[in-house]
Amino acid sequence: LIRGQEGAKAGENYHDLDIWGGGLNANLSWFLGKTAVGFDISKERIYSTALGTSLAENDYKDISGSDRKYDHKGERTNTNIMLEHNFIFGGFTLSAGVLANKNTGLDHDFRFYPGVDISYRPNDNWKIYASWNKALRMPTYTDLYISNVVQQGDITLNPEKNSTFKIGTRYRQTGFSAVLSGFYAHGTDMIDWVQTSETEQKDSKYHVMNIGKLNNMGYNLDATIYMQELI
């Protein structure tokens, strides 16, 4: 914001974001386990003074409580179709599924994101588990469209893609539980705001970019005492 100025001159932006959608889910238990299917669809629409593509003047939208108008608009539709199956045999549980996703902000193609979870319970106290899944994160409207004195968005951004592996064990008895787990996440096309020697030749702004690969590793140790169970 610019001190001493008001409205557009002060750098104020107005945004009106609507998200609506719905979904259906169903599951079936049979002799090979439990199968679930699902479908959901959601639509995002933003009117803004800064984010989105420029509107024709006759399509401007009034801003409540202001003499300014929304002169930018963005919208995209996200569709998910899910299939998952759970199989239990003795102390083993295996869950495998796939998500088919289409986002019109990217293109009109479906992309598939699988996932697998497996766990083993040798007794009532212990659980050992592992999982792997793939996921995608779309750029935000800010990532795509923002343009001011310090930031520059990019409408050609690719979505972030992640593959995550987890492994862990859980112990539970009356009054106490403990979890030890570790993870490894491999990301590509990760989105970040950066300054480089190339961008500094153009301006002093931070530019949003797909910076490439990013690997994260970590572990977690958590212990909980349930006093109400010990009393």
Where does each model-flagged region fall?
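Short hydrophobic/aromatic-rich motifs at helix boundaries and adjacent loops
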Residues: 45, 85-91, 136-140, 190-193
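Structural detector of well-ordered beta-strand residues that form the stable sheet scaffold
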Residues: 95, 129-131
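Short beta-strand-initiation
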Residues: 21, 80, 113, 152, ...
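Face-selective signature of the C-terminal outer-membrane beta-barrel domain
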Residues: 1-111, 119-121, 179-180
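Outer-membrane beta-barrel signature, preferentially recognizing the C-terminal barrel domain
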Residues: 107, 121, 127, 134-188, ...
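Flexible, surface-exposed loop regions and adjacent strand-edge segments
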Residues: 2-12, 52-61, 113-115, 145-152, ...
